[in-house]
């Protein structure tokens, strides 16, 4: 059995749950950071194992990849929490060897825990693993009003200093608790990060355009995002460039300022589809020159401000008539 997943914190939680369920039946875990998505799909296809469980990966923009997986494997199960376009799943209903479980209200780790683990591991281990998945959920779904939010941010910061496969084993071997030295490491990382944030502001890597803040430092995007929103900014965008020259735009909307209809409209107007998460989505675009890049910034601000000014506090489903 193959496990195909993301490479982030939510993938770690999903891995822990999948491993707890299937153990040694999992022969290999494939990770993608989306930049190599098609390559990893092809690697999974040529792998001799015929059963694939996929977690925390969005196929909203890559339906052909999902078709290829299903057509080349005996059985594929997808557990995911990203948004998908309306009627996306209709074309997949023809496959008898495919099952999908989608819930965009919680992170993939919590879905995996609820779907895979009842009755599988001891109650104590299940509680400990669920507690970890809850912290992951607070980070991955960006629940900024949750009391665990700051701790979740620090957990994610620490996570990116580790090898995901080695960390998964270490947490499992420690009874679904973080390794004993994690607290000291997290404190040091947090203190170092605060200095990096200060440097980012001093080096003019943070720029405001009305209610929108642009951040040109992906490494400290999250702490700057939190700071900016605490100071009243409503949309924060991180812009950085991949090695192949393409630009990535990570967009985060402050919670509770737009209704769901407006959040969907924002995604449609900026990237042309409803994908990612309502308050957090990204897209990649080829930019040829500084003028095009400047126009992209202006477009993001314009679309957001227009929707912000026109936003009505009720979605159509909520209107009581």
Listing of model-derived features with the role each one plays in the protein:
Residues 155-159, 173-175:
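Amphipathic alpha-helical interface segments
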Residues 166-172:
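Metal-ion/cofactor- or nucleotide/acyl-coenzyme-handling active-site neighborhoods
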């Amino acid at each position: 059995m193959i496990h195909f997943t993301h490479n982030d914190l939510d993938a770690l939680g999903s891995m822990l749950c999948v491993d707890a369920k299937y153990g040694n039946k999992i022969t290999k875990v494939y990770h993608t950071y989306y930049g190599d998505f098609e390559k990893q799909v092809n690697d999974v296809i040529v792998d001799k194992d015929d059963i694939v469980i996929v977690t925390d990966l969005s196929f909203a923009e890559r339906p052909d990849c999902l078709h290829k997986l299903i057509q080349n494997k005996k059985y594929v199960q997808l557990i995911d929490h990203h948004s998908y376009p309306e009627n996306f799943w209709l074309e997949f209903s023809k496959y008898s060897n495919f099952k999908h479980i989608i819930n965009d209200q919680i992170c993939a780790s919590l879905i995996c825990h609820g779907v895979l683990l009842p009755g599988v591991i001891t109650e104590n281990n299940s509680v400990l693993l669920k507690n970890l998945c809850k912290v992951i959920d607070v980070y991955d779904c960006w629940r900024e009003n949750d009391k665990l939010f700051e701790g979740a941010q620090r957990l994610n910061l620490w996570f990116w200093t580790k090898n995901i496969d080695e960390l998964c084993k270490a947490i499992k071997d420690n009874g679904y608790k973080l390794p004993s030295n994690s607290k000291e490491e997290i404190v040091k990382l947090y203190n170092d990060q605060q200095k990096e944030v200060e440097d980012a502001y001093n080096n003019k890597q943070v720029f405001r355009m009305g209610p929108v803040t642009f951040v040109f430092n992906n490494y400290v995007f999250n702490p700057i995002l939190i700071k900016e929103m605490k100071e009243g900014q409503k949309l924060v965008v991180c812009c950085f460039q991949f090695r192949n020259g393409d630009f990535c735009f990570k967009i985060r909307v402050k919670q509770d300022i737009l209704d769901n209809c407006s959040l969907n409209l924002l995604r449609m107007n900026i990237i042309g589809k409803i994908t990612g998460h309502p308050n957090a989505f990204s897209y990649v675009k080829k930019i040829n020159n500084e003028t095009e890049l400047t126009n992209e910034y202006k477009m993001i601000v314009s679309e957001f401000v227009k929707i912000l000014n026109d936003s009505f506090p009720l979605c159509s489903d909520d209107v009581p008539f």
